[in-house]
Amino acid sequence: MSKTSPYTSAFTACSFLYAEFNAVLPLLRSDNADVLLKEEVVNRNYLKVNNETSANRILHEFRRRYKSVPQDFWDWYDSLEEAAQKAALLYVIIKTYKLIFDFHVHVAIKKWNSVDHTITTEDLQLELLDVSANDEFVDSWSDQTKK
């Protein structure tokens, strides 16, 4: 099976992690980001995880998020209060991960525009089934990944 899918389950590796992302953001913005991020994988000064493999996976996803928006976004982001930063980080996540975008558009917005504003696990599972029916890569995910 060729990996031509726009989807990834990588979001599950580090979820939202607002505080951790903010702690690492200066490293991402640095001119020597590669060196600093490698040091963070080894020392884990900001990421409180047990091993280098987990730290590496999280930092890989943080880098993807960081690169998904223009550089001047991060200047604006730094000027925001915490609540606005969390909303801005949600925007970055929606922009980075197509599955999260689809959940937002096909589940959250649909619920927002309906009488029932509650999003259930079943709502998300139904959307994932729809995606899975049309994407061989997503369909190949284990049941554990799909949870």
Describe each model-derived feature in a short phrase.
Residues M1-L90:
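Eukaryotic partner-binding/assembly regions in large regulatory complexes
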Residues C14, I94, D143:
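Conserved phosphate/pyrophosphate-binding and hydrolysis machinery centered on Walker-type P-loop NTPases
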Residues N50-S54, S142-K147:
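Short amphipathic alpha-helical interaction segments
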Residues R65-S68, H106, K110, D130-N134:
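Amphipathic alpha-helical interaction surfaces
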Residues Q71-W74, W112-H117, N134-V138:
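Short, solvent-exposed secondary-structure capping/transition elements
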Residues A87-Y91, K95-T118:
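Positively charged, polyanion-binding regions of nucleic-acid-associated proteins
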Residues T120-N134:
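DNA-recognition alpha helix
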Residues D130-K146:
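Short, positively charged loop/turn segments that connect secondary-structure elements
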